[in-house]
Amino acid sequence: MKNILNFTLDELKDWMDKNSESKFRAKQIFQWIYKKAVFNFDDMSNISKSTKEKLKENFYIQIPNVVKKYVSNIDGTEKFLFEYEDGNIIESVVMKYKHGNSICVSTQIGCRMGCKFCASTVDGVVRNLTSGEIIAQVLKAQKEICDRISNVVLMGSGEPLDNYDNVIKFLKLINDEDALNIGQRHITLSTCGIVPKIKELADQKMQITLAISLHAPNNEIRKSMMPIANKYTLEELLDACRYYYRTTNRRITFEYALVKGVNDSRENAEELIKISKGMLCHINLIPVNEIKENNYERSKSKDIEEFKETLIKHGIETTIRREMGSDINGACGQLRRNYIRNN
């Protein structure tokens, strides 16, 4: 038995053809799943009984269960703990804006990257999610909020480029007009900086936004915060970023979590200006989320503002990330860890 959500439309057409079914049935099934949110073959009224039986013998539609749901009293952000059939739990977050609903999805159960400011990596990685398991987060969230999701952010638990093949398939699926039809420019992928995979992603020539978890203006600080920096230098990472925007003509976003006394000085800001000058980029400053397992403290609000103003004065487009759902353990991985610890 296979999870039908792991199939592209072309793959499902091929399966239909090889199993003596008309190829157009594949498109009908896609419409039921992705357009009408019907996750039971028996409820697909324009599919013949014999075809339904064949589908049930060969496929299932894996939609995770909601084990916990939290709704922010501040901004209406909805955070879900989803449980897959093997008992593993991940989290997804739906953020509501005037321009539409955005979902932050997880790409792995846990993470092996070891970034010191991130809760999802504390217990390591359990396994990769399949493309179907990632897209199921979007399908289930839409069903829960009774509204369409128009933007997708790959910033939940896991390193997307450490699960490259499944993530690429997921991106193509959600962009497919016969599936969720979410425009590539409404998709953001965040990575800690796996240099060869950034270049591979560039060669896909997608129009998604690439967000780099930079968090430091030099190799010394970055190595202290992110183990990946011991494998790829800042210079190698920036070279990959230049390749990405030359290939795709898409602006890079640099994410920079400000940690008190670590990377938030004026000198650090000036170093950041130096390495980002001349690049088609935007810097997103993030007040770091404090995690019990590390000793990082959030920079003071006035220091964050001063850091931002220093960058802006030198022509660097800079914003401070708006905190969504801060009253319900919004930091990546916090909800999952707390739930597992208490159950």
Swiss-Prot record:
Record: residues binding S-adenosyl-L-methionine: G158, E159, S190, S213, L214, H215, N289
Cited CDD domains: Radical_SAM
GO cellular component terms listed in the entry, alphabetical order: cytoplasm
Gene3D superfamilies, A to Z: 1.10.150.530, Aldolase class I
Disulfide links within the chain: C104-C332
PROSITE patterns according to UniProt: RADICAL_SAM
Annotated [4Fe-4S] cluster binding sites: C111, C115, C118
Catalytic activity: adenosine(2503) in 23S rRNA + 2 reduced [2Fe-2S]-[ferredoxin] + 2 S-adenosyl-L-methionine = 2-methyladenosine(2503) in 23S rRNA + 5'-deoxyadenosine + L-methionine + 2 oxidized [2Fe-2S]-[ferredoxin] + S-adenosyl-L-homocysteine; adenosine(37) in tRNA + 2 reduced [2Fe-2S]-[ferredoxin] + 2 S-adenosyl-L-methionine = 2-methyladenosine(37) in tRNA + 5'-deoxyadenosine + L-methionine + 2 oxidized [2Fe-2S]-[ferredoxin] + S-adenosyl-L-homocysteine
A GO biological-process term: tRNA methylation
EC numbers: 2.1.1.192
Keyword rRNA processing: yes
Family note: Belongs to the radical SAM superfamily. RlmN family.
Reported function: Specifically methylates position 2 of adenine 2503 in 23S rRNA and position 2 of adenine 37 in tRNAs.
Miscellaneous field: Reaction proceeds by a ping-pong mechanism involving intermediate methylation of a conserved cysteine residue.
PANTHER family on file: 23S RRNA METHYLTRANSFERASE (PTHR30544), RADICAL SAM CORE DOMAIN-CONTAINING PROTEIN (PTHR30544:SF5)
Official protein name in the record: Probable dual-specificity RNA methyltransferase RlmN
Organism per entry: Clostridium novyi (strain NT)
Name of the gene this protein is made from: rlmN
